Amino acid sequence: MLSNSAICIIGGYDELSKSLFKILRNKYKSTIFINLLSTIHHNKNLYNYNIFELKKILELLKKRNVKDIIFLGKIARPNLSNFKNDGIVENYIPKLVAAYKKGDGAVLDAVVDIFKEHNFRAASPFKYCKDLSLSNSDVLKKYKKEDIIDIKKSSELLDALSEFDNAQSVVCAEGYIIAIEAVEGTDALLHRSRQLRKDLDQFKTKSGFLVKKIKKSQSRFIDLPVVGPRTISLIKKANLKGLAIDIKNTLIYKKGDFLRL
């Protein structure tokens, strides 16, 4: 990053994005955060905007001399009924409507493209914070044959589902696909898997994995899979053996606590 330019995080102001904002602000005082959640938050260099207030957002980015944008933090799917003309955003409605028909991933990709059109760079969170990722030394390198079967089956299923812009997570145990992530998110998926394993009389045996990975054609700049200490806690409660992820494309929340668990 150039010394006279700034970084901006755009997304929902949640625990993960908040933690990165704190880290970046300590390194780069000019870092700003644009919160797109409906819940208003207050902090230094934090701004609250509706996702359709594109003109105001672009003006702020230019005023603060932002070059790199990190897209991070959960946001609700934009409701087009809340749309209002602002002189710029209406130019992108056809593009967003077309993306809506394809799925959430396409909508997020369209959002990234809009900012690129205005000469901003999409930056990976990993570029500025190595603590959000795991290294090869942090992960197990050998698996039992039955574990490889569960992980491989889950990975292939997620690749197939990528065509439908759907899930990033699957639970597979003893060769059975137990549950596929839908709109409920990973925590709810693991709660559901725990109950299903009980119903299938699997729960007494520790087996299976939560497998998380990005969609095949997904942007590496937005909506990356996230795991943290709570993920590990829920994996244990579901009596699964563990977690399988793509360490190059998965964000780790509270890495120290995550590894201790």
Question: Predicted segments — roles?
Answer:
Residues 2-36:
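N-terminal basic/disordered segments at the start of proteins
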Residues 36-42, 46-66, 84-96, 103, ...:
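Feature captures the catalytic cores and cofactor-binding loops of soluble hydro-lyases/lyases
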Residues 57-127:
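N-terminal glycine-rich phosphate/adenylate-binding segment common to multiple enzyme folds
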